[in-house]
Structures are given as C-alpha cells and as structure tokens.
Amino acid sequence: MGRSKKKGPYVDRKLLEKIRKLNETGEKKVIKTWSRASMIIPEMVGHTIAVYNGMKHIPVYITENMIGHRLGEFAPTRRFGGHADKKAKKGELKK
C-alpha cells in the first residue's frame, strides 16, 4: 500500500535543507545521505547524491526520469557472487 497523496512525498528534512541551500547558491557538489527512503523530487534534478548501501556511498546523478522514485532504488545493497561452477560440483559428487 502506497503513501497517501494527502501527506505528500517523504523527503528527509536535512537532505531537503541541503538541496535548497545548493539551489540558492548554484553549487554542484555531492551530498552524502543515509536516507534511502527519501523520494526524489523535482528540486533534486541535476544534483549528485551519494546514497549509502550498507557498505559505502554510491553516487547517484538525479535526472528527470527518476522523479517519484526512492533514492535507495538506485544504490543496490546486495552483491551477486555468481552461481557455483558446474565442474566443481561434479568433482564433489564423485568423492
């Protein structure tokens, strides 16, 4: 179930303050955040936000297509190590 339209999008208060300050000054610098649940709003377009994935901050450049999505969608938290090698499995079965 999605968030009520009456409430509006959730954006971390401190993140929003930093974005607005950068928009006023016209600066373009990377903003670090741990708020993966924050929704991307039009004010963020053109900025680079470093989203924490549990191990490190992943830089995400915000474009117009991303509006309405969450920041966490663009910073994957899991690494795929690959499937087991078939040759290694056959060797184990013979023993």
UniProtKB/Swiss-Prot annotation:
Region (Disordered): 76-95
GO annotation (BP), single: ribosomal small subunit assembly
GO MF term set: rRNA binding; structural constituent of ribosome
SUPFAM superfamilies recorded: Ribosomal protein S19
InterPro entries in UniProt: Ribosomal_uS19, Ribosomal_uS19_bac-type, Ribosomal_uS19_CS, Ribosomal_uS19_SF
Keywords in alphabetical order: Ribonucleoprotein, Ribosomal protein, RNA-binding, rRNA-binding
Pfam families, per database record: Ribosomal_S19
GO cellular component: cytoplasm; small ribosomal subunit
Basic and acidic residues composition bias: residue spans: 82-95
PANTHER family: RIBOSOMAL PROTEIN S19P FAMILY MEMBER (PTHR11880), SMALL RIBOSOMAL SUBUNIT PROTEIN US19M (PTHR11880:SF8)
HAMAP family, per database record: Ribosomal_uS19
Role description: Protein S19 forms a complex with S13 that binds strongly to the 16S ribosomal RNA.
Family: Belongs to the universal ribosomal protein uS19 family.
Protein name: Small ribosomal subunit protein uS19
Gene: rpsS
